[in-house]
Amino acid sequence: MKKKIKILPLVFLLFLFTHFVSAGISFGKNVAVEYIGGNNKGNIVNSLKYEIKQILTKQEDVNLYEAHKESYITINGLVQKIFGNKIINDAEVSNDVVKLKNGQLTGYTHSLFTEEKLKKYSKDIDEFSKYLNNNETGFIYVQIPSKTSGDSQQLPAIITDYTDRSFNQIISVFKEKNVNVLDLRSKIKEQKIDIYSLFYKTDHHWNSFAGRWAANEIGAVMNSDYGFTLDLSRLDQENFYLNKNPKKFLGSWGKRVGPLYAGVDDFDILIPKYETSFVYKYNDITRTGSFEEALIDYSFFSGNYYHRFTYCTFLSGNFAFINIHNNNFSCDKSVLCIVNSYSCALLPYMALSGYKDIYAIDPRVNSFSAKYYVDKYKPDVVIYMMNTDYDSVTLIK
């Protein structure tokens, strides 16, 4: 503890020194620009007055902050780590970053769904379920777990998290309407899986290992409850090799506190050993080839930690609509998935198990209704799998 106390003033002084040096360099540069080619060209006194006025009106401070924002975040994260702070507050409370006892970062849910919202969800689901039933289309809700679906004792004692209770509210709505439910949280507990091994340390998303595991669980229900003939042996662990990419990923929570607060993540990807062939339609782009060629996009490894969106390596990231066609399909059936960004690490592995076509929409960026895509593509089953963003979903309109 004494060492921490001695180090803290040095860190703070380093922060101030860096700030003032940056400010001085920026001020001198801007005075020179104003003197050489600005409105006060050739007049050093007026150039100085102009730049001082800019500082006093805060415009210069804004520019300086934007220019060095990443450095400030990194230094602040280091200071927070040294102080041992487990909760990093944001101006927007939903963006607060929490460090669990195991060192992983997370957010948390601040409240339950209101009765008004639940009634709306219930009405929409009831109408959509009846529409699918009339069209002889299967319907299932898959509850995607959250990192806080694990041990609640991992959270700081001051935090009250409503994540699992809000999931239970949603599940109750689906069950009341006689919609089949696959709760992956229960499967994790039944199989005694370490839930934190399924997630990145600095991000809310789950990883490649979770994607393969969840694809197998979903496929088993497709076979048992909907008459699919998926070859789930394709998802056996021994049929993959691990493409290791150490320290490639600073997740969304990590970007709010910097890489020194909780470290950075490896971004390891499970790649099938067997031959694969896909046609992947992503928004207006089409890619063809093997699993790795069509569904994995390594261009997102470029840039520094703050500018690198590594999670988008799966499927090239968020989409309005995608279609994954498996040229080596083992099951002549298709599904329409209503998803959010968690699907990026899941759908590539679902595709491996042999669906002829997987169609997916992300309602956060797609204004068309699910009904529109059901009418257009005639899927055998609609899979509604979310853990947030329920308000963005339009089922029928």
Regions found by a protein language model. Name each.
Residues M1-K397:
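Extracellular glycan-modifying ectodomains
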